[in-house]
């Protein structure tokens, strides 16, 4: 019965059978009437069966999809708003293998290491570096962006090496002359076969991945304050609160809002002071916040509390410091001119002379292998730092 049902439910089979019977009905000597009658009946069944299957197929077929709307004709939505990366690295197509995980990109590994080192040395976890290719760049070019704004760029040549002249080399090298993007030193891109010669002449030799990574690290350090946003500040306080919950609770928001704490930390980072010792920072802020609210003044208090660590960061564990001092009379003039309470202004000629003499003294210190450090009264320290 299933076979019969399948046969009579298939219009194609019925049509074929009707055609065969119709041909037989036309042959002389055959029972023509019977064959033609059967052919007509099967043809009618095939016609009705075809209509029924078409109706079923129409019911089961989903409605045709609406024609696609061109992107430019669609209404704007929040999905069109693309967040700006806090920190990004864009590379030309020849540098893609350096950052491609599938190709075991060496630069990718170095960037991960840089972020970990930054967290250990500076004291907070910065935003991840978002890496993407940019076909608008030259094939060997790269650029570093901070909040959508370019802060650095350069060229790198995979397979070649940058020979950097530290200032004392014994001869020139053949290659593509350039400048070290991180520190501005003269350099040359050389082939791998020239590495030993470059080392022998006194050059510092690094590969392409190291060039880009060093440049990126230099810019991250110099823009540390901008990388410390509200999210990073809150995460930093939450991290400290795991071991010192009461300390953080007493500070934020009871004494200071989160924005003020962020600004204090940014002031410290702007002046090259790391914020690793958050316990001392939070304690100092809690002690000072009842008398002070200005983030700049609070940062000064924190600097004093961190002074042993700041000195050791510059000089190492030494008991005597070799510093540059200012003559008493000049110090008096500067104090009168640079303090906020005084209406006097620093004479432009004196400012130029001061900058020149300070640069000369700093060079002498550096030539003797000593950090350049100028000793000034606390009340003019910030102004002198900006001036010099």
Feature roles, as predicted:
Residues 1-47:
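Transmembrane helix-loop junctions at the membrane interface of multipass transporters and ion channels
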Residues 33-37, 48-62:
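Juxtamembrane/interface segments at transmembrane-helix termini
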Residues 56-388:
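Membrane-embedded alpha-helical signal segments
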């Amino acid at each position: 019965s299933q076979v019969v049902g399948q046969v009579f439910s298939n219009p194609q089979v019925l049509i074929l059978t009707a055609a065969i019977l119709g041909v037989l009905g036309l042959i002389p000597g055959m029972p023509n009437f019977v064959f033609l009658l059967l052919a007509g009946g099967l043809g009618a069944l095939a016609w009705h069966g075809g209509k029924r299957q078409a109706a079923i197929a129409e019911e089961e077929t989903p409605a045709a999809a609406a024609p696609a709307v061109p992107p430019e004709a669609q209404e704007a939505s929040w999905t069109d708003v693309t967040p700006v990366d806090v920190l990004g690295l864009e590379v030309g197509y020849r540098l893609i293998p350096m950052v491609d995980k599938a190709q075991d990109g060496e630069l990718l590994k170095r960037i991960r290491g840089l972020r970990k080192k930054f967290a250990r040395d500076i004291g907070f976890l910065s935003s991840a570096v978002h890496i993407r290719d940019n076909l608008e760049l030259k094939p060997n070019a790269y650029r570093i962006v901070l909040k959508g704004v370019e802060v650095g760029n350069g060229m790198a040549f995979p397979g070649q090496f940058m020979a950097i002249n530290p200032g004392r080399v014994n001869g020139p090298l053949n290659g593509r002359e350039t400048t070290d993007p991180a520190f501005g030193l003269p350099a040359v891109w050389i082939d791998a076969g020239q590495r030993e010669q470059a080392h022998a002449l006194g050059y510092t030799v690094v590969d392409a991945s190291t060039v880009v990574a060093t440049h990126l690290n230099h810019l991250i350090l110099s823009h540390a304050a901008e990388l410390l946003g509200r999210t990073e500040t809150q995460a930093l306080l939450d991290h400290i609160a795991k071991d010192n919950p009461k300390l953080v609770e007493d500070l934020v928001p009871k004494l200071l809002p989160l924005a003020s704490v962020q600004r204090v930390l940014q002031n410290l980072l702007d002046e090259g002071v790391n914020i690793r010792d958050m316990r001392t920072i939070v304690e100092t802020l809690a002690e000072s916040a009842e008398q002070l609210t200005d983030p700049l003044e609070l940062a000064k208090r924190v600097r004093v509390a961190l002074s042993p660590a700041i000195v050791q960061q510059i000089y190492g564990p030494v008991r005597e410091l070799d510093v540059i001092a200012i003559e008493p009379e000049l110090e008096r003039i500067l104090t009168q001119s640079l303090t906020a309470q005084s209406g006097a202004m620093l004479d432009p000629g004196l400012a130029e002379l001061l900058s020149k003499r300070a640069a000369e003294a700093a060079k002498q210190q550096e030539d003797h292998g000593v950090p350049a450090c100028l000793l000034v009264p606390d009340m003019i320290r910030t102004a002198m730092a900006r001036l010099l």
